[in-house]
């Protein structure tokens, strides 16, 4: 395996992650244009000499509508984003049941965090603990007032000081490199599009079962029941495609940040092998027993879901928030 220096890996992942993040608004606006174009195409055209209706796309009309609608969509998404962005810290704490950890309660953990912060030249984040026998840790927050490192009691019981320093160094690197802010941004964008997709699918379901598919004459008399259904189906397809691409983009962002956090954590604690050893122990029993939300699980140092084998490993790898633990350990052991 080709040797990749820690700083080189960090710079490379930063560039790639920045490009991936730009893709989110591009996907949203792109799918909106496709939706408008599809509606225009299926509702615009002319009859040929044989009397058949020929669909025709009026690109100028689509662009004009897009210019009128886009600002409203962007404004709505912006309001949604701001509300979700600034309420995420309380949501995460409530979902995980995390409680603040004070120095007098656990000086071992507090001192490790404090020493690593001094070594890295960064401010001390909050430290939370979750009473759970499983092994995991994660970083959260969007600014210095909300940055938090959370660990489980199972992690504290099973890891020695060097291994715990490696794990905490990993999480501090997420904070130092603003990964938590980046991941929260990606989670919110995916949540917005998934909500739109679910809403459109629900509207299609309601129309099918509560009056959307009457006879052909009924549809004509009512003035476009079928047209409305066609609009909803086109909307569902566009939202579904946008959801797929945003999910793939979000997962790619998360995987790259994990590699970078491993490299930064190893550099911060000065012992890559200790972090590799910690990952082996955590992989045997990862997760949080009372939390099943995938948007929170993607912040864990190891995701509790296992990758498949062979072809399924490739497919599941595309939809994985974390690279394989074995690959992460191999990279740490080469330093």
Language-model regions, residue ranges each:
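Active-site recognition of the HExxH zinc-binding catalytic motif
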Residues: 89, 113, 151, 166-174, ...
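Hydrophobic or amphipathic, alpha-helical segments that drive membrane association/targeting
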Residues: 1-134, 186-259, 269, 283-286, ...
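Soluble periplasmic/extracytoplasmic beta-strand elements of cell-envelope proteins
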Residues: 84, 128-129, 150, 166, ...
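Helix N-cap/coil-helix junction residues
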Residues: 122, 177-178, 270, 334
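Short pre-active-site segment immediately N-terminal to the catalytic Zn-binding motif
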Residues: 101, 153-166
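C-terminal capping/extension segments of zinc metalloprotease domains
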Residues: 1-12, 263-281, 285, 291-335
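Catalytic Zn2+-binding segment of zinc metalloproteases
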Residues: 172-188, 273
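Catalytic zinc-binding patch centered on the HExxH motif and its immediate surroundings
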Residues: 130-147
């Amino acid at each position: 395996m080709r040797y990749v220096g820690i700083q080189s890996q960090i710079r490379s992942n930063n560039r790639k992650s920045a490009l991936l993040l730009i893709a989110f608004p591009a996907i949203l606006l792109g799918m909106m244009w496709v939706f408008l174009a599809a509606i225009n195409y299926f509702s615009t055209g002319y009859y040929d000499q044989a009397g058949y209706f020929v669909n025709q796309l009026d690109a100028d009309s689509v662009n004009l509508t897009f210019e009128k609608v886009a600002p409203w969509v962007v404004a709505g998404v912006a309001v949604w984003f701001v509300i979700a962005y600034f309420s995420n810290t309380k949501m995460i704490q409530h979902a995980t049941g995390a409680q603040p950890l004070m120095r007098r309660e656990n000086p071992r953990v507090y001192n490790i965090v404090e020493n690593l912060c001094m070594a890295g030249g960064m401010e001390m984040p909050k430290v939370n603990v979750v009473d759970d026998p499983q092994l995991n840790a994660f970083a959260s927050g969007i600014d210095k007032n909300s940055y938090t490192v959370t660990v489980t009691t199972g992690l504290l019981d099973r890891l020695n000081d060097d291994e715990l320093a490696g794990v905490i160094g990993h999480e501090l690197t997420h904070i130092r490199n603003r990964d938590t802010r980046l991941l929260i941004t990606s989670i919110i964008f995916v949540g917005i599009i998934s909500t739109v997709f679910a809403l459109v699918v629900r509207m299609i379901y309601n129309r099918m079962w509560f009056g959307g598919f009457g006879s052909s004459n009924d549809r004509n008399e009512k003035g476009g029941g079928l047209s409305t259904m066609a609009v909803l189906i086109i909307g569902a397809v566009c939202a579904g495609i946008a959801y797929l691409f945003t999910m793939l983009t979000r997962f790619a962002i998360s995987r790259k940040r994990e590699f970078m956090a491993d490299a930064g954590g190893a550099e911060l604690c000065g012992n890559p092998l200790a972090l590799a050893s910690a990952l082996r122990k955590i992989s045997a029993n990862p997760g949080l027993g009372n939390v099943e939300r995938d948007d929170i699980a993607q912040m864990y140092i190891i995701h509790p879901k296992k990758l498949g084998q062979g072809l399924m490993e490739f497919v599941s790898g595309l939809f994985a928030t974390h690279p394989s633990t074995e690959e992460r350990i191999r990279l740490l052991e080469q330093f």
